[in-house]
Amino acid sequence: MQLKRVAEAKLPTFWGDFLIIGFKENQTEHNHIALTYGDLTGSNPVLTRIHSECLTGDALFSSRCDCGIQLSTALRYITEEGQGILIYHRQEGRNIGLLNKIRAYSLQDHGADTVEANQCLGFNADERDFTVCADILKLLNIQTIRLLTNNPQKIEILNKSHIIVTERVPLIVGRNPKNSKYLDTKALKLGHLFSSYYK
C-alpha cells in the first residue's frame, strides 16, 4: 500500500454533508483526500470520481479547462445518487506541478496545445499515477465502482490494480470558446471520450 489514512472530519458543503478523509503517501508524504457521502457498506458499485487537482480551475474559476465545473458537477451527482466518493488526487497539472503548469499555459498562449506544452517542458503528456487512487479505494474497503470520467486510462489502471469498474459514467460539462482547443486535444491525443456512450 502506497499510502496511509491519517485524519478525517465532517465536511458540510453546498451539496450536502460529506466526510473528508486525509491520506499521506509513505515515500513522499504527498497528501490526497477523499470525500465520501452516504452509506458505502452495501454491495452495489459505488459512484466514484477521481478528480485531479487543478488550482486554477477548481479555486480560481479558470475557463481554460473544464476542471472546476467537473468538480462541482461530480459532487452534485454523488449527493443526488445518495452515496459516492470523490478522490481529490493532488497531482497538479497532470503531475507537472503548479509552476510548470503556468509555464505550460504560457506556451499555450503562444500556440502550443496542452500536450505539446508539457513535452516542450520535458514532461510526458500525462505524468499522473492513478495507482494511488486505487490504494485509496482499497483503504476505504471499496472494490467495485461506477467511475465518473471521460478518461479511459483511469479505468484501465484501476482494473489492473484490482478495482472493478462496472460502468463509465460520462462527465461532459464546461466546454466554452476558451477551452475548446484544450478539450479537442484531450480527445485527439489523450484518448478522452466526449460521447454519451462508452466505447
Curated annotation (Swiss-Prot):
Q: Which GO terms describe its biological process?
A: riboflavin biosynthetic process
Single GO molecular function: GTP binding
Catalyses: GTP + 4 H2O = 2,5-diamino-6-hydroxy-4-(5-phosphoribosylamino)-pyrimidine + formate + 2 phosphate + 3 H(+)
| Pathway(s) the chain acts in | Cofactor biosynthesis; riboflavin biosynthesis; 5-amino-6-(D-ribitylamino)uracil from GTP: step 1/4
Q: Where is the active site?
A: D126, R128
**Any one GO cellular component localisation term in the record:** cytosol
| UniProt keyword annotation of Transcription regulation present | no
What HAMAP family does its record include? RibA
Q: Quaternary form?
A: Homodimer.
Show the PANTHER family listed in the entry.
3,4-DIHYDROXY-2-BUTANONE 4-PHOSPHATE SYNTHASE, GTP CYCLOHYDROLASE II-RELATED
Protein purpose: Catalyzes the conversion of GTP to 2,5-diamino-6-ribosylamino-4(3H)-pyrimidinone 5'-phosphate (DARP), formate and pyrophosphate.
> What's the protein called, per UniProt?
GTP cyclohydrolase-2
Q: Which organism is it from?
A: Blochmanniella floridana
